[in-house]
Amino acid sequence: RKIDDANAGVYRKSQVFISGSKYPLPGPDKVPQMMKGVVQKIADIREKEHPVAAAAKAHLEFVFVHPFVDGNGRVARLIMNLVLIQSGYNIALISPVRRAEYISSIEAAHKDDEEFIKLICSSVIETQKDYLRMLNI
């Protein structure tokens, strides 16, 4: 899906919903302030958590606000991978085979983020194994 130029990089101005989710997203009027909080929370998480757990939690912090009309998951994964790279880890690629698990673990993370963190941990490991296989190591 391609986002139109008027909405690219701009906080959403309308209410959005995630189909299948029982957790409502914040209203558009709350997004700017919540995003300031997300930036601070990510900084705090990075100081306290293991880098892989911090990356997973940074992803969740962003995606729970869902600040854009489109591309929130992609941006959340970019943030997650930035945290990983800055901490000396390789990126975590979520296999298309695990997409349903990825979505359900995000939904479950509203109450307990352990399943999502485990998914990201295993994705970091699997991505590293894929790199090694490609290099015949």
Describe the function of each predicted region:
Residues 1-70, 74-137:
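FIC/Doc superfamily catalytic core
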